[in-house]
Amino acid sequence: FSSFHKDKSPFGRGLYRKQLHLEANADGWLLELPEIFSACKVYVNGELIHSYGNLSRKDYEIHIRNALFSLPSGYVELLIDTANYSHYYSGMIYPPVLGTSSDILHLVNCRLIFYAFLCFFTLGCAVISISIWFRRKAGALYIAYGILCISYAVHISYPLIHWLGINMGVLPYVMEDGSFFVILTCMTVLTYRLCSHAFPRIIHLAAYAFCIGMLLFVPLSHYVLFPFLPSFVSIYGDVMAIFKIFLSLYLIVAACIISYQNQDDIWMLSANAVFGFGILIDYLTAGRYEPLHFGWQTEYCGFIMVLLFTVLILRYSRRILLEREYLTEHLKEEVERKTAWLTRMMDERKEFLSAVAHDLKAPVAAINTYIDYI
């Protein structure tokens, strides 16, 4: 809505109107309506069929969710009345999908299964990794991997939240954006640990500070800056774009440099490079790519990153087990060697004491005889 306001405020109210002529279909017609930012009323042929939130400026209430409703055959007039006074998106951002009932249900089910698999698979990996770290007091790699998986699962869970219809205001978007920066913070820390010599230290520190700053910047923007300074929304978008370009190049270049220097960490570096590449592609294709069945570029690359880290964790765990087996075997050999050495020392001492006792017999006998004479 910013083009309608002199101060370029993205907040306001808008009306979308679409006229359709749908042929008779035994299967019926369904319309999938994605998130409408941030409150809306949906009318079909003048009849109100859905209402989410409150559009009034005075009593404004946000309610963002996905919706699915049927349309009649023949002439259809679709009206979507929207209002937004809180989010960096306004109105209809993602296109609705119209089709037969079976096609739309198949589409929605495939998408939900896809996101549920990504979410719960990574949560399972996180639980296993953190439990290993907690029970065995293992290395920091396990807890870092666990936090990474939890953050990715939170970041990927937004379709499930929107379809459940739970009204949590802007909190799901704060969680989605915040978890993204937690992932990048973990990646930055791991990159610094692996290739601190690839760049000057100031670059690593700048990347880490940028991630932490953006992590704090997200809730500050949603809860303070956007409501009281609407024009800041455009600045927020520019900051996000600069951040994505910088971090993607940082991860990719660092991975390429260190891969030639240390082949042992190739799995971790590959994960960094894949995720950095996904961030860059997502930025370059913004507004040009809309997933129909499955996910976005960063979501694919993020899952590949999790899989690469899974391989890294498995290799690390295998190496730890082999080291323990090696130490156990050599500990047994060491115990046997020490036992033989102690046995030999005891025998030598017995022989020494026997010789001393034998040498002392004659002087003792002479002393006893002398005492008897006295």
Can you name each region flagged by the protein language model?
Residues 1-26:
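Extended carbohydrate-recognition surfaces in non-catalytic/accessory domains of CAZymes
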Residues 22, 26-44, 78-82:
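Aromatic-lined ligand-binding clefts that engage carbohydrates, nucleic acids, or primary amines
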Residues 127-149:
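Juxtamembrane interface at the cytosolic side of transmembrane helices
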Residues 94-113:
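Short, aromatic-rich amphipathic segments at membrane interfaces
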Residues 329, 336-374:
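Primarily the dimerization/phosphotransfer
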Residues 44-77, 82-94:
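Beta-strand-rich ligand-recognition modules
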Residues 107-134, 241-258:
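First transmembrane helix
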Residues 153-328:
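Interfacial "cap-and-anchor" motif at the non-cytosolic start of specific transmembrane alpha-helices
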